[in-house]
Amino acid sequence: MAEQTTKDDKPLFGRPWIFIRGVPAMKFLPPEGPLEVAFAGRSNVGKSSLINALVGHKGLARTSNTPGRTQELNYFVPDGFSGEGGDLPPMALVDMPGYGYAEAPKEQVDAWTKLVFDYLRGRTTLKRVYVLIDSRHGIKKNDEEVLALLDKAAVSYQIVLTKTDKIKEAGLPKLLADTAEKIRKRPAAYPGILSTSSEKGDGLEEVRQAIRLTVGIPF
């Protein structure tokens, strides 16, 4: 696929981003067009903070994560595109519902699982899922279940460690190595592990570059 450029040659992450849609069911998905990358992770893993930090908009993801939208797929795109007549954004970020919260009723968990699996299995424009893991806790059982779901759906995913400012700096190399070993034999896992701190800004450019490479946008 040829590399894309963004409208007016503005850098992908150098322009404003906006929330465009919350998707509670497959029938509400936007038409397939721009490539998509999605973010998944346990509740309170720092998904909203990371998305906000990546696009430089402190309140963007939080605005869409109000009660009632927490079980939706939330779509964000660069601003300045009408969405009509071929004037489409170059890509979309998709914030997936957080998982692993004990108070969620079974019906809600089942609905989330169906929505997410249907999305993963049937969305041809989805290029990669970034699975966020809290550095303080590592990969937990809930995460293993999601990784297995991604493997089953044959969707490429990459692990992103979050909140690295909350652990000792000397422990990060071992955590990276241990995490890489845990996913080494998983068929859909991308081998490189990313590490971030939204609070300190660490690792953000590496994630941006990973996204650019994934969707074929050079800058």
UniProtKB/Swiss-Prot annotation:
GO cellular component: cytosol
Annotated SUPFAM superfamilies: P-loop containing nucleoside triphosphate hydrolases
Keywords (A to Z) from UniProt: Cell cycle, Cell division, GTP-binding, Magnesium, Metal-binding, Nucleotide-binding, Septation
A Pfam family matched in the record: MMR_HSR1
Binding positions (GTP): 41-48, 68-72, 95-98, 162-165, 196-198
Domain EngB-type G: 33-217
PANTHER family: ENGB-TYPE G DOMAIN-CONTAINING PROTEIN, MSS1/TRME-RELATED GTP-BINDING PROTEIN
Function per UniProt: Necessary for normal cell division and for the maintenance of normal septation.
Protein name per Swiss-Prot or TrEMBL: Probable GTP-binding protein EngB
Organism: Rhizobium rhizogenes (strain K84 / ATCC BAA-868) (Agrobacterium radiobacter)
